Swiss-Prot record:
Keyword tRNA-binding listed: no
Reaction catalyzed: Hydrolysis of (1->4)-beta-linkages between N-acetylmuramic acid and N-acetyl-D-glucosamine residues in a peptidoglycan and between N-acetyl-D-glucosamine residues in chitodextrins
Active site (catalytic residues): E51, D69
Protein name: Lysozyme
One Gene Ontology biological process: killing of cells of another organism
Signal peptide stretch: 1-19
UniProt keyword terms in alphabetical order: Antimicrobial, Bacteriolytic enzyme, Disulfide bond, Glycosidase, Hydrolase, Signal
Species this protein is from: Hyalophora cecropia
SMART domains: LYZ1 (SM00263)
The enzyme's E.C. designation: 3.2.1.17
Domain of life: Eukaryota
Length: 139
């Protein structure tokens, strides 16, 4: 039993070490590469900074409804991603696919959420970005 606990601890540490934290300008460059609308770029950066702290592997605390949020964009598993190994829900992805350093899958899902709900789908944006956005002019 002790061997399994140690193994799990080592694996958890190894997985966390692989996580990426974007710099603000690094995030802007990656979002541009993935085709995000330049006129909304400050909003996306603000959202990511307030939802995940720019960490690709962020898993949020359990929400009141029992759901969780995953990845850079903190995408919710109640509607958008499947907790299992089979892709599903509205983005047709697993939640683990949203936790990788390659954010292309997460970005596609985030764009889908935005198309349907705008930024109102994210509390991080609603609570922190409506009245002030980060300056990304140097990026």
């Amino acid at each position: 039993m002790t061997k399994y606990v140690i193994l799990l601890a080592v694996l958890a540490f190894a997985l966390h070490c692989d996580a990426k934290r974007f710099t603000r300008c690094g995030l802007v460059q990656e979002l541009r590469r993935l085709g995000f609308d330049e006129t909304l770029m400050s909003n996306w950066v603000c959202l990511v900074e307030n939802e995940s702290g720019r960490f690709t592997d962020k898993i949020g605390k359990v929400n009141k409804n029992g759901s969780r949020d995953y990845g850079l964009f903190q995408i919710n598993d109640k509607y958008w991603c499947s907790k299992g190994t089979t892709p599903g829900k509205d983005c047709n992805v697993t939640c683990n696919q949203l936790l990788t350093d390659d954010i292309s899958v997460a970005a596609t899902c985030a764009k889908k959420i935005y198309k349907r709900h705008k930024f109102d789908a994210w509390y991080g944006w609603k609570n922190h970005c409506q009245h002030g956005l980060p300056d990304i002019s140097d990026c």
